[in-house]
Amino acid sequence: MGVATTLQPPTTSKTLQKQHLEAVGAYQYVLTFLFMGPFFSLLVFVLLFTSLWPFSVFYLVWLYVDWDTPNQGGRRSEWIRNRAIWRQLRDYYPVKLVKTAELPPDRNYVLGAHPHGIMCTGFLCNFSTESNGFSQLFPGLRPWLAVLAGLFYLPVYRDYIMSFGLCPVSRQSLDFILSQPQLGQAVVIMVGGAHEALYSVPGEHCLTLQKRKGFVRLALRHGASLVPVYSFGENDIFRLKAFATGSWQHWCQLTFKKLMGFSPCIFWGRGLFSATSWGLLPFAVPITTVVGRPIPVPQRLHPTEEEVNHYHALYMTALEQLFEEHKESCGVPASTCLTFI
């Protein structure tokens, strides 16, 4: 089939009010991504030592009772996923979703999402909200964006991200989703993970993939088709201070990742009120998420290494082909190549 894209608003000049609304949409996502989890964790702790301590105790009891919910499908809210603020976030860059092939809802899928970028903006916008009409482009599919399991330990923030359909990137959680009797489950895994964020340099396309094979094993165990997904522009919305491999700064980043599960990055965007100053507002660079063709995978409860390596190689080839087919239409120079590490 031909390429299908999401419907975008007419490309007319934006009013000042529209520009402000888009900036608010982009900025609130950054602030939520960076600070909501730590803020509510600290708040719940501090309230224990005030007259409002019953609120913290009540929530901690609820947290104990609700502990396994993220690994059992979470609590998705279509009301949250359809809010207008996500359309403002979409229009700020803008973010587009491109469909290159049909994904029939009579089977399950494991979508490998690349690159991770700093904040996975394109993937959240396209798979965790309806701002680009995922359910219309892929009718019958139920998307799940798999993220760092540690995020679901953070009070209040865990409930917030569950409402988008986010789930822990853990075997227990993903096995639960792909074992549901209702087919059409589409698990989106950012294969490069937090380590790949260290290579989120504008203009570069470096993926941590050569040794990442867990997603292939997952697909084999459940007979779920593999689907390559590439988000052009994801690395371009922030500037990153990249440290040379082997430097003490890079060593500190890797050590921190081993301890905490994510890599601390030094990054910056533009100022909220001035495009020439530094700040946390991302640069308004177009993000185009291209969903590739499905790769049929047989079900193997105990896949061999040969089978894993075979389908991993097929996936890498399909991903590279997807990149080559769409890079020029997405503003990437023809001479640019995809790099796997």
Swiss-Prot record:
Alphabetized PANTHER family for the sequence: 2-ACYLGLYCEROL O-ACYLTRANSFERASE 3, DIACYLGLYCEROL O-ACYLTRANSFERASE
Catalytic reaction equation(s): a 2-acylglycerol + an acyl-CoA = a 1,2-diacylglycerol + CoA; an acyl-CoA + a 1,2-diacyl-sn-glycerol = a triacyl-sn-glycerol + CoA; 2-(9Z-octadecenoyl)-glycerol + (9Z)-octadecenoyl-CoA = 1,2-di-(9Z-octadecenoyl)-sn-glycerol + CoA; 2-(9Z-octadecenoyl)-glycerol + hexadecanoyl-CoA = 1-hexadecanoyl-2-(9Z-octadecenoyl)-sn-glycerol + CoA
Phenotype upon changing residue 265 to Y: Catalitically inactive. No 2-acylglycerol O-acyltransferase neither diacylglycerol O-acyltransferase activities
Pathway(s) of this molecule: Glycerolipid metabolism; triacylglycerol biosynthesis
Function of the protein: Catalyzes the formation of diacylglycerol from 2-monoacylglycerol and fatty acyl-CoA. Also able to catalyze the terminal step in triacylglycerol synthesis by using diacylglycerol and fatty acyl-CoA as substrates. Has a preference toward palmitoyl-CoA and oleoyl-CoA. May be involved in absorption of dietary fat in the small intestine by catalyzing the resynthesis of triacylglycerol in enterocytes. Also able to use 1-monoalkylglycerol (1-MAkG) as an acyl acceptor for the synthesis of monoalkyl-monoacylglycerol (MAMAG).
Glycosylation sites: 126
InterPro entries xref list: DAGAT
TM annotation in the entry: 29-49, 50-70, 137-157
CDD domains recorded: LPLAT_MGAT-like (cd07987)
Matching Pfam families: DAGAT
Keywords assigned by UniProt, alphabetized: Acyltransferase, Cytoplasm, Endoplasmic reticulum, Glycerol metabolism, Glycoprotein, Lipid biosynthesis, Lipid metabolism, Membrane, Transferase, Transmembrane, Transmembrane helix, Ubl conjugation
Name of this protein: 2-acylglycerol O-acyltransferase 3
GO molecular function: 2-acylglycerol O-acyltransferase activity; diacylglycerol O-acyltransferase activity
Processing and modification events after translation: Ubiquitinated. Ubiquitination leads to proteasomal degradation.
Annotated family: Belongs to the diacylglycerol acyltransferase family.
Coiled coil (UniProt feature): none
Tissues in which the protein is found: Selectively expressed in the digestive system. Highly expressed in the ileum, and at lower level in jejunum, duodenum, colon, cecum and the rectum. Not expressed in the stomach and the esophagus and trachea. Expressed at very low level in liver.
EC number of this enzyme: 2.3.1.20, 2.3.1.22
GO BP terms, alphabetized: glycerol metabolic process; monoacylglycerol biosynthetic process; triglyceride biosynthetic process
Biological source species: Homo sapiens
DNA-binding recorded as keyword: no
Single GO cellular component term: endoplasmic reticulum membrane
Cell location: Endoplasmic reticulum membrane; Cytoplasm, Perinuclear region
